Swiss-Prot record:
<comment type="function">
    <text>Catalyzes the epimerization of the S- and R-forms of NAD(P)HX, a damaged form of NAD(P)H that is a result of enzymatic or heat-dependent hydration. This is a prerequisite for the S-specific NAD(P)H-hydrate dehydratase to allow the repair of both epimers of NAD(P)HX.</text>
</comment>
<feature type="binding site">
    <location>
        <position position="55"/>
    </location>
    <ligand>
        <name>K(+)</name>
    </ligand>
</feature>
<feature type="binding site">
    <location>
        <begin position="121"/>
        <end position="127"/>
    </location>
    <ligand>
        <name>(6S)-NADPHX</name>
    </ligand>
</feature>
<feature type="binding site">
    <location>
        <position position="117"/>
    </location>
    <ligand>
        <name>K(+)</name>
    </ligand>
</feature>
<comment type="similarity">
    <text>Belongs to the NnrE/AIBP family.</text>
</comment>
<dbReference type="GO" id="GO:0052856">
    <property type="term" value="F:NAD(P)HX epimerase activity"/>
</dbReference>
<protein>
    <recommendedName>
        <fullName>NAD(P)H-hydrate epimerase</fullName>
        <ecNumber>5.1.99.6</ecNumber>
    </recommendedName>
</protein>
<keyword id="KW-0479">Metal-binding</keyword>
<keyword id="KW-0547">Nucleotide-binding</keyword>
<feature type="binding site">
    <location>
        <begin position="54"/>
        <end position="58"/>
    </location>
    <ligand>
        <name>(6S)-NADPHX</name>
    </ligand>
</feature>
<dbReference type="InterPro" id="IPR036652">
    <property type="entry name" value="YjeF_N_dom_sf"/>
</dbReference>
<dbReference type="InterPro" id="IPR004443">
    <property type="entry name" value="YjeF_N_dom"/>
</dbReference>
<dbReference type="Pfam" id="PF03853">
    <property type="entry name" value="YjeF_N"/>
</dbReference>
<feature type="domain" description="YjeF N-terminal">
    <location>
        <begin position="10"/>
        <end position="208"/>
    </location>
</feature>
<dbReference type="GO" id="GO:0046872">
    <property type="term" value="F:metal ion binding"/>
</dbReference>
<feature type="binding site">
    <location>
        <position position="153"/>
    </location>
    <ligand>
        <name>K(+)</name>
    </ligand>
</feature>
<keyword id="KW-0520">NAD</keyword>
């Protein structure tokens, strides 16, 4: 298994790569889209959960890629697009330009065939708020396959501890490197399902 890394190490590698002018979010989104396309049953609707940070941008890029492949995709953007970071805002603009459908709340009775969890990733360091927890609980109650991006939402990426009741993923696709919280025995490893890594071509130094 590839080595795991702290959030600080992953962030540092990301910053160094972005400083060269290389854009990573489109690469992450394309990798997630390929992952879903290889596993989704024909005709199933994909719901991409896009949170307020760059994890949400990865989900938006994945949604745009899947739509371009001909899949039926919806985006749930509970916190709106106004406060998105620059790269995530660019991903949202691409989703809009592609004609994608964006919801702020779930449609009554809607149940997707597969969920992309791009709510928080490695950025979560405090317990899920009540509204976010309610959304996670709804997703878990659907009992449909979930692909988590980087880390299942509701997990502390460094410690692997639960920050509420986390998303229960079937797969977790980590970008750049696997967070330590997915390797250690505990809620993080239990919630992540099958853990895979796409380095996006970023070189990580081995963790100590």
């Amino acid at each position: 298994m590839p080595p795991s890394h702290s959030v600080a190490q992953i962030r540092d590698a990301e910053r160094q790569t972005l400083a060269t002018g290389r854009r990573l979010m489109p690469l992450a989104g394309a990798a997630a889209a390929r992952h879903v396309a290889a596993r989704i049953r024909p005709g199933a609707v994909v719901l991409a959960l896009a949170g307020p940070g760059n994890n949400g941008g990865d989900a938006l890029e994945a949604a745009t890629g899947l739509r371009a492949m001909g899949h039926d995709v919806r985006v749930l953007l509970p916190s709106g697009a106004q406060g998105l970071p620059a790269d995530a805002a660019r991903a949202y603009a691409g989703w809009q330009a592609a004609g994608g459908e964006t919801w702020s709340t779930l449609e009554p009775g809607f149940v997707p065939g597969l969920v992309i969890d791009g709510l928080f990733g490695i950025g979560l360091n405090r317990p899920l708020g009540a509204d976010w927890q309610a959304l996670v609980d709804t997703v878990n109650a659907w009992n449909v396959p979930v692909l988590a991006l980087d880390v299942p939402s509701g997990i502390d990426a460094d410690s692997g501890e639960a920050l509420g009741r986390p998303i229960q993923a079937r797969w977790t696709l980590s970008f750049i490197g696997r967070a330590r919280g997915l390797e250690r025995p505990g809620p993080g490893r239990d919630a992540c399902g099958i853990s895979e890594v796409d380095t996006l071509g970023v070189i990580m130094t081995p963790a100590n």
